[in-house]
Design a protein with these regions (language model features):
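Asparagine-centered strand-capping/turn motif at beta-strand->loop junctions
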Residues: 21, 25-33
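Intrinsically disordered, low-complexity Pro/Gly/Ser/Thr-rich segments with frequent PxxP/GP/PP motifs
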Residues: 49-80
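Short acidic, flexible loop segments centered on an aromatic residue
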Residues: 30-48
Length: 134
């Protein structure tokens, strides 16, 4: 059984510096079992963060919401768009490790604030590519 979630930016980004933002994310666990969020990262070159570990992990009961904050680097000009950005979550679900990949489109408003739209969410078991390696 794989996790089912919805992830979206939870309100406006808050500036720490002109290119540094604290962004909140709402994670809705749509599954029938609890979801445990271990880590999150933003890997895109124009909308990025280091991996953030959650210690203790964030536990989200079935059919409930959780919230995380990630410090992101984004110095794009007002009016710019960043395509194919991602939020990647490392989670445990039903005693198995998973990656949740939320593909984002980032729009930079007229004040330089990034705002995301979630375009697609996929899940993959951790180690899935090793099964196909020779």
């Amino acid at each position: 059984m794989e996790p089912k979630v919805h992830i979206e930016q939870d309100g406006p980004a808050h500036a720490q510096r002109p290119d540094r933002w604290v962004i909140s994310w709402n994670i809705q666990n749509l599954g029938a079992a609890p979801l445990q969020v271990l880590a999150a990262r933003l890997p895109h070159g124009k909308f990025r963060s280091e991996e953030k570990l959650f210690e203790p992990p964030l536990d989200i009961p079935a059919n409930e919401n959780g919230r995380i904050e990630i410090k992101a680097c984004c110095g794009e000009a007002p009016g710019a768009e960043v395509e194919n950005a991602f939020v990647i979550l490392r989670v445990n679900y039903v005693a198995a490790p998973w990656l949740i990949l939320a593909r984002l489109r980032i729009r930079i408003d007229d004040r330089g604030k990034p705002a995301s739209t979630t375009e697609l969410i996929t899940v993959q078991p951790v180690g899935f590519s090793e099964r196909w390696a020779g």
